[in-house]
Amino acid sequence: MNNCLSCGAKLYENITIYNLFKKPNRLCDRCKENWDNIKLDIKARRCSRCLKHLNQDEAYCLDCKFLSAHFNLMEQLYCQFQYDGLMKEMIHQYKFLKDYYLCELLAHLIEIPQTSYDYIVPIPSSPAHDLSRTFNPVEAVLKAKGIRFDKILKMSNRPKQFHLTKKERLADENPFIIDTELDLNGKEILLVDDIYTTGLTIHRAGCKLYAKNIRKFKVFAFAR
């Protein structure tokens, strides 16, 4: 008998010929419904590249327009969940309250996109942050899901930037460092991050990858 990964309730499932060889349920019906309710509405009017929700008076995505003036844009963002409600609370508990075992829940919820790429590359945290929480939040989820990845990027230590404006963050030094002997020339990269907000972090990482002559990069985020 298993417990729900989200609420801990006991899961009862009758074994029949129809479900004998299926993977066991890991969420109770109530939690499955709650998580389904915060999935991105793919029918809503969104930017085709970054999935930002667009108002009726927005003819194009201002975020992508801003980024395109400074970076070669990612080809596509893939994401299944809104960064809101249950997901926002869970990521806060996982990253900032250091609840490591929530990586199992995240690994169960997310689905790596079925798209072409040569390397899956997690977006790193600063060494100080990983040392403080004792794990890297993105890598832990990928490991829990059994996904092979390559640690091509490193991040230098820097102060948290949530209080800075977009322009102030842009003026700051790029914190990413390429740390690999892999030949990235002409390769397609899938960057993986926990949250996609303004896109600056992702595109700064992409900037370093383009300097190594990658062909293009796509992004998968746990929440947007």
Where in the sequence are the language-model features?
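Glycine-rich phosphate/pyrophosphate-handling loop used in enzymes and phosphotransfer proteins
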Residues: 1-224
